[in-house]
């Protein structure tokens, strides 16, 4: 769980402390630093669709969405509880819409030429073909690893907070290295993409801390 009430300086770093951030690829979203203090980015926007998952704390999705708004994404949130996303929606302003379903996403016309982000916390995972076009990113937030889900069986990346998610991911994705993410210390996140499993210490700016405080 991301804890924002008390944030030890030794765990949560300021972006200005990491000069190598400038070397990150344009399609990656900075998450934080690994155990060697190297920047870690999550692939999030590409020439094809990107499918992501978040496990354990919806505020991870808030952070990702906020950073993707900063690189020009238009945001759609599908949820049964819009209040859960109120701070993110307020920050996004007219670049965000919220509703109970993803009907009509991704946008067509001039808006469809911009990067499109769909964040959903609905119990059912999105259809695997949703947003199957360039610069479309889908992010599903779940409290447990959805077994038997075609979407989750083909995710490009997962961020997780808390204990016990690594082993189910290892089974679902045939990724034994995901088991290394079962035991995260307070203030840490686990990142699993198609190439690696890594423990990450998040890097948060002051504005992001305020955004993540309930």
What is each PLM-predicted segment?
Residues 1-98, 194-214:
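Extended, compositionally biased accessory segments flanking or bridging domains
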Residues 49-184:
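ATP/nucleotide-binding catalytic cores
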Residues 166-214:
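Conserved GTP-binding G-domain of TRAFAC-class P-loop NTPases and closely related GTPase folds
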